[in-house]
Every structure is written in C-alpha cells, then in structure tokens.
Amino acid sequence: MLTKRIIPCLDVDHGRVKKGINFVQLKDVGDPVAIAKAYQEQGADELVFLDITATNEARGTLVQTVEAVANQVFMPLTVGGGIQSVADMHALLRAGADKVSLNSAAVADPSLLTAGAEKFGRQAIVAAIDTRWQADQNRYQVTVNGGRTPVDLDAITWAKQAVAAGAGELLVTSMDADGTESGFDLRLYQQLTAAVQVPIIASGGAGSTADFVQLFTQTTVSAGLAASIFHFGELTVPQVKTALKQAKVAVR
C-alpha cells in the first residue's frame, strides 16, 4: 500500500521565505535552509519551494537557495516559479531539486512539459494547476499568474492534457479554499483522480488534522500540501501523521 505524503510548502522571495513563519526554535525565520531542516526533523515527506518573485534577477538567487537547501536536507525537493525553459529546469535539477513544477508557462506552451519529460524523465516534471470553481459554467477554471488571471480552460481537461504532454505528477491548488483553513475541496480531487492516473498533490484549505483525514479517506490523492498551518505552528507534521495513522491511513 502506498503511503500518503505530507508536504510543507515554502514561498521564497529573493532567497527568503515569506508568508510569515513562527517556528519558535528558529532564530532566523526567513532562512529557507533553517526552515527546511526544521521540517525534515518533523518528518515531512517532501518539500515544495515556490519562487514567488520568479523574475530573471531572482533566478540566480533561487538556484543558490536550492543548492543550499539540497545540501542540508535529504527529503525530495520540488521547485517551481518562473520556469520558462528546459535550461531553467536543468539549472534547478542540477542545483539539487528532485522535481520541477511548471504552472503558467505550461498552460501557455504544453510542449515544455514534453521537452522536460523527454530530457529528465516524467518523474521529474510536475504540472501545477491553480483553479477556481466557475459556478455559471459548472466547472473548475484554470487560473495563471499566481491565481490572478483566469483562463478559458477547464481544469480537469487541462489536467488530462498536462499528463498526456509529459507531467508525471500534478500539484493542484483550489484558489477558493487557499488560505481559508476550512478544508480541502474534496469534489475537485475526486474529479481529478477519476480523470488521471498520475499522483496528485492536493493544496489549499488545510486547517486541521481532520481535514487531512478527510482528504485521504474521501479521495485517492497521493499527498496533502499546506503552508500557513505548518509555518505558524498551528499544526505539526507529526500531529497530522498521528491522526492519519489513527484513521488507518498509511503514512511513513
């Protein structure tokens, strides 16, 4: 039985972690290496790093940051934000990322997923999808540019296309649930897991251990991702895993 993964997410801005973090034991709450090590000690299964500046001037900083984290941390690292080319992917993978995540650039040009998968293998290519429920169309709509720009594209359709193009995993964020701490959008993940056969990371809405239990007992996603609840110390990774074990969900 495949174990379910718990994945903290770090938003990095010019080499510093943002979104406010108050790990009590950390002197420098903005240092990605210190924060990554703290999550490793907690038993996180993977880490996702999203470069939110993702401009060309910040690109070099991101490579250095990934290198510094990869030297200190032994769990898989997925890095995304502003990846525009196979060369960008190569630089991050060479710096120590295990997987690269493409979002807006892949929507604009799905052949990027294909090129990445051909060069580095599908397992290294993650398609990140930010979506909102569009009630008048009765569908989940794809958004790009950090969820700010809606695209006339059905998220389930795009998930299938991304997998066909070469994505070996999907990281899907419900922009409606994101930051609310009111639970994952179960309907979204039920539809996605019925539509594609690759692992799916669910993101957006985690607020309690019960939310993770619900996610893994009511959908077949592979992983649950969260940022604020872990950063603010509202929940720890061990607390989530303990609750999952009690609910008979297999975790590492």
Curated annotation (Swiss-Prot):
Its main location: cytoplasm. IGPS catalyzes the conversion of PRFAR and glutamine to IGP, AICAR and glutamate. The HisF subunit catalyzes the cyclization activity that produces IGP and AICAR from PRFAR using the ammonia provided by the HisH subunit. Belongs to the HisA/HisF family. Pathway: Amino-acid biosynthesis; L-histidine biosynthesis; L-histidine from 5-phospho-alpha-D-ribose 1-diphosphate: step 5/9. The gene is hisF. GO terms for molecular function: imidazoleglycerol-phosphate synthase activity; lyase activity. This is Imidazole glycerol phosphate synthase subunit HisF. SUPFAM superfamilies: Ribulose-phoshate binding barrel. Heterodimer of HisH and HisF. InterPro entries: Aldolase_TIM, His_biosynth, HisF, IGPS_HisA/HisF, RibuloseP-bd_barrel. GO terms for biological process: L-histidine biosynthetic process. Its EC number is 4.3.2.10. GO terms for cellular component: cytoplasm. The active site is at D11, D130. Keywords: Amino-acid biosynthesis, Cytoplasm, Histidine biosynthesis, Lyase. It is found in: Cytoplasm. It comes from the Bacteria.
